[in-house]
Amino acid sequence: MHWNPFLFGFDSNLKLVSILEKEFIFYRNLESRQKIYFEKRVDKFIQNYSFVGKEILVNYEMKALIAATYVVLTFGMRNYRTTMFNTIIIYPSTYYSTINDTYHKGEFNPRMKLIVFSWEDFLSGHKVKDNINLGLHEFTHALLFHALKSKDASAMIFHEEFNFVVKYFDNEDFLNALRVKNYFRAYAYTNKFEFLAVLLEHFFETPNVFKSEFPELFERLKRMLNYKEIQ
């Protein structure tokens, strides 16, 4: 039995709808009832998480783009919200982190319950389909942390499929085959956590190529996210 979000009323926010129609192919491809579901989740995200600008004024469109990126990633999950972060900090561009004395484009800090983005890099990742998407990347880290800590059904499936992904990562022959294909960027092979984050960037940015080149791995990620392909 599937939970039906459409049993509950929700009035569409016209400003939000305009942003989603313009900026998200994923949203445009949904059926009308699914669009309402998507809008409701974006609206709830904006209401439930704090957005803090550092040397930048955060407007509604910025919040909507960030929230919708998270909703794209979690759209198939019944339990999609997480307590692994409560605040999203936005810098105009790359920022200096005192934690490891280096410049960052983005990060997930579970101890401080923060997601941090360089807006310049977030926007570039959103606009350009080059398999580099900062929003998807950092939110994947947060979702994995949630999956490792939580016992809800969505988290358990995510965790279970991550364990399969780790088996791929630990298989040196398989990794060598991936490197030969040169589809995933080198950063994917840093560790198993970055491997998953990069995989999901590719999953959403160039799904047809991913599915064609690595169908078994693609199916694992579909199950992980309870993702339904748009025909």
PLM segments and residue spans:
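A metal-dependent hydrolase signature that marks the N-terminal structural subdomain at the beginning
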Residues: 1-105, 110, 211-213, 217-230
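Active-site recognition of the HExxH zinc-binding catalytic motif
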Residues: 31, 129-147, 197
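Short, well-structured alpha-helical interface segments that form or flank functional binding sites
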Residues: 37, 61, 130, 134, ...
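Single-residue recognition of alpha-helix boundary sites
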Residues: 42, 148-152
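Metalloprotease/metallohydrolase-associated module, dominated by Zn2+-dependent proteases
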Residues: 46, 66-76, 93-126, 152-231
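Short glycine/proline-enriched turns and hinge-like loops at secondary-structure junctions
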Residues: 82, 127-128
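Generic beta-strand structural signal
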Residues: 86-88, 113-115, 132
